[in-house]
Amino acid sequence: MNSPCDRLQQFIQVLLEESWSFPSFANTLHWPENLLSYIDELVWQGSLQNFHQHEVRFDKPPLRLPLTGFSSLTENWSSRQAVSSRLVATAASPPAGCQAPIAFLGLKFSSLGPARKNPALCFLYDQSNSKCNTSWVKENVGCPWHWCNIHEALIRTEKGSDPMFYVNTSTGGRDGFNGFNLQISDPWDPRWASGVDGGLYEHKTFMYPVAKIRIARTLKTTVTGLSDLASSIQSAEKELTSQLQPAADQAKSSRFSWLTLISEGAQLLQSTGVQNLSHCFLCAALRRPPLVAVPLPTPFNYTINSSTPIPPVPKGQVPLFSDPIRHKFPFCYSTPNASWCNQTRMLTSTPAPPRGYFWCNSTLTKVLNSTGNHTLCLPISLIPGLTLYSQDELSHLLAWTEPRPQNKSKWAIFLPLVLGISLASSLVASGLGKGALTHSIQTSQDLSTHLQLAIEASAESLDSLQRQITTVAQVAAQNRQALDLLMAEKGRTCLFLQEECCYYLNESGVVENSLQTLKKKKSSKRS
């Protein structure tokens, strides 16, 4: 009987022979990224044929999945009489019974310093000579003799060459350095469960290691929790979909996605007169709220009669955009500090017009009954919290590896920063303060109204959206299928740039979400 690995290889080979379009097929079936990493390794070994014609590569380490072995690599070193410890990398093992190798990718050791030289690793478990198993060796993790087994960082250039420790030669990375890769050929051997110690050397000829490393494997059985979590996400998505759709469109199949949020931002940029939007990227961050409250320059002048129902408002907190150019709010209904606002007007009771809100201490409301000096209350409009990059700026970002460079804010343009000025002037010119808040989104006939309808129609809508994003962010590193619930639409997804989901604006300013197009642009930026 064939082993699980053999059957998996046969299954993958059949799929490829049927001429599937792999990018679309992979995203439609939600192939886990550690499986794709495993496929990539099979290709390298020559087990699969004609695979690289699909031009699919994955640079990130395998993701943690339920019911898999989860291995970690820790570095311990001393510097100036201080002992430091750092988790360098993690990797997911295949299911028990399938002895496929795993790899720690892009290892960057803090103890090596900027020189990096030509490092080597020494492990205690694979020493065959008795002189390399003395108490001194075990205490110092030392391999001072040439007959000890030492794994030097090599460049894997041929299929026949399969070193354990080798240089990461993938493109990109700062200064052209992408770290090192460490391959474990037998991840389910019992020794990895108890933990394996080793030494890291700046060069194989050095007597003492610069750091000690430890590799350990644990078995994760989180399938029940992830199943429940996926079910909750799907239920929340169905609830949100029904809230997003107008009554006339309830029968149509539609759902909220990152593309909807990005489209809102692109159309809003165009309708407010922002120029030169072609060949740009709009990005939404998982860890950032989808909407931002932008303060408006003048008070609301809007009245409703007693029979007009007051629409509900989104629950939860919405962050307030702070303009770095103007350090004061243009108008406040109340403030605990007069220096915060250019103008303040005390009110006893007033309603907000359609698509307008009162922002009071991080909470949104449609009716302002009373204010006090201890509360900051502002008239606001909700804007998608997106980041705008040019192609050159995106190229700069793609050239860096994790963590994201600290000076990102010097070139990234936050959408509310652009719209906070242009939107304010356009709203005043279009009738703000004369009985109606004419939001620029309202004038665009071809713009999807889903997001605004959700905000106006149900108090639960924003809460539901935020809950989904928060939930997905928690499992994004564990389950790519859950991430695709919001990011993918029928085999298409965004360009996932570190922690952001990015879409390309073509020559006409239209959002383009073809995965293949974006991956080509990503490749061209890295070359």
Curated annotation (Swiss-Prot):
One biological process term in Gene Ontology: viral translational frameshifting
Keyword Disulfide bond annotated: yes
Chain intervals for the UniProt region annotation (Transmembrane protein): 412-527
Span(s) of short sequence motif CX6CC: 494-502
Top-level taxon in the UniProt lineage: Eukaryota
Nucleus recorded as keyword: no
Compartments (UniProt record): Virion
Tissue occurrence: Low expression in skin and testis.
Residue window of motif CXXC: 280-283
Post-translation changes: The CXXC motif is highly conserved across a broad range of retroviral envelope proteins. It is thought to participate in the formation of a labile disulfide bond possibly with the CX6CC motif present in the transmembrane domain.
Annotated region (Surface protein), positions in chain: 1-411
Motif CKS-17, residue range(s) on this chain: 477-493
Spans annotated as Fusion peptide: 412-432
InterPro entries: TLV/ENV_coat_polyprotein
Disulfide topology: 494-501
Keyword terms, alphabetized: Disulfide bond, ERV, Transposable element, Viral envelope protein, Virion
Site label Ancestral cleavage site, positions: 411-412
Further remark: Orthologs in P.troglodytes (truncated), G.gorilla (truncated).
Family recorded in the similarity comment: Belongs to the gamma type-C retroviral envelope protein family. HERV class-I F(c)2 env subfamily.
Function according to Swiss-Prot or TrEMBL: Retroviral envelope proteins mediate receptor recognition and membrane fusion during early infection. Endogenous envelope proteins may have kept, lost or modified their original function during evolution. This endogenous envelope protein has lost its original fusogenic properties.
Free-text note regarding domains: The CKS-17 immunosuppressive domain is present in many retroviral envelope proteins. As a synthetic peptide, it inhibits immune function in vitro and in vivo.
Record-given protein name: Endogenous retrovirus group FC1 member 1 Env polyprotein
Gene source species: Homo sapiens
Gene name of this polypeptide: ERVFC1-1
